[in-house]
């Protein structure tokens, strides 16, 4: 099977900061890839390059046989991008916003209306279809963002902390939705800090630190002969300790008897 996404020698530098350092990766159709790493590791930069948001980089990226640098607009048609609470036109209603998004992908009005209604209903938002989104909670806006990223039935779905602000029922639904999309042959690139979710839903886990891939495999392969959780593996590969020492040091800041403002 040919990979649907091929990344070769990908590098990106911001001034003197190396965000990505010569990473290479193959992603195959029907896979859920968990892409994890500490803050500043290069996760968001990778996502923005794949989505065509950042176009100034070194290396080669091919998506569905299309060179990203040569035809970024064609690649964007194949990708559904679901970020963590990006800027929205929140003076619009969900109906207006999703119609706008659908038009960007040249969908017919009837298709937009049908898909929007069904997806909003699944999230319990159909009664709010004509309500301005500036009155929505964080979770409600995130649900609309998820719908907007899937409205055009993309071949590849890229999610960057998609569960932010969602209620428990919506989280369960999204996790089930990922499995449905996978069964349909879609490729899921899931970027998150939520280790327990990544561990449960991913076929492969790619761990990035300091702009470099430090682990790439199934959870079983990453565990090797241990039974450590993904959280423990993450800590072992990206930190000098398991967090216990740092947590104790943090807590000692307010236990210091000489600290000004201490409450008796």
Locations of regions flagged by a protein language model:
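A short, surface-exposed alpha-helical micro-motif characterized by mixed small hydrophobic
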Residues: 198-200
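Catalytic Walker B motif of ABC-type/P-loop ATPase nucleotide-binding domains
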Residues: 157-161
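Conserved ABC ATPase "signature" region
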Residues: 99, 103, 110-128
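Conserved ABC transporter NBD signature motif
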Residues: 59-70, 74-75
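ABC ATPase "signature
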Residues: 216-217
